[in-house]
């Protein structure tokens, strides 16, 4: 007999008991570089279409992936090997796979600097393990080539198959090449032009913005920093490039104690995950939730015999959920319901609708 259901949500109580002493202490200070970033200083995404060769009969089935044979034919013609259209269509390349190559171009990257790339199969290749990515142009959103990638693909997974059975550990159709691309073109990044830079918080909060401004003004002098809104602040910087870099380095390492964020519960219906911060509280309420399970007979199938499938629904009794003033109380109250994570998602949404859950509910 197989029963479809989740594990009971009692692990959360253990987690809360372990981390609660940390939350009872005052909030720790964080560096400005951990809270905010300079506007315009960011990475840029690159993408390219490449070919992985050297696979051990685990490449694309070229009869089902015509773009692989077309790419190989184009590459061979550039190398002086010309094939007729009929020859190109008859290519059977079990050791070749078409792949998309992606990378992030860090800010201030200069030509000649190596960057990591990710190689992902886009056809029906079984594995990229042991393959080599041939020279691939990586382009930005503007269509310009910013890096060239090539190298051996490192795949963290492993797999084997025999006699119709197959075992796979981790993912085999994607891998990485550490330092596999070389930057060919730099992206201009203007910092401090006009004598000011703009800092942007990762999360909007008026209180934290004001604390960052106060910390900068205490160190660099009154009027150096000024809040713009709940996310941005403007900071006056030296005109000289060397002095500007030194000044920003000191500013980024200043300690600031951020204001506690809003109470929030994040749930993922696909995995049954529930995460909440320490500001979540509960008002007293009553909850009744029936448990639904599906039972499938796992016996040997016989021709002409219908499968034995049963749907069972337990009677949910009305339970009193006590008010909780801190995370430990909230977890204890929810754990008392005895609901599995999937049921808990529906309970939390109903609590929010009833006004008993004092937190923002976010579904990802």
From Swiss-Prot:
Single GO cellular component term: outer membrane-bounded periplasmic space
Subcellular location: Periplasm; Bacterial flagellum basal body
PANTHER family given in the database record: FLAGELLAR P-RING PERIPLASMIC PROTEIN FLGI (PTHR30381), FLAGELLAR P-RING PROTEIN (PTHR30381:SF0)
Quaternary context: The basal body constitutes a major portion of the flagellar organelle and consists of four rings (L,P,S, and M) mounted on a central rod.
HAMAP family named among the record's database cross-references: FlgI (MF_00416)
Family the entry assigns: Belongs to the FlgI family.
Function, as annotated: Assembles around the rod to form the L-ring and probably protects the motor/basal body from shearing forces during rotation.
Record protein name field: Flagellar P-ring protein
The organism's taxonomic lineage, starting at the top: Bacteria, Pseudomonadati, Pseudomonadota, Betaproteobacteria, Rhodocyclales
Gene symbol of the encoding locus: flgI
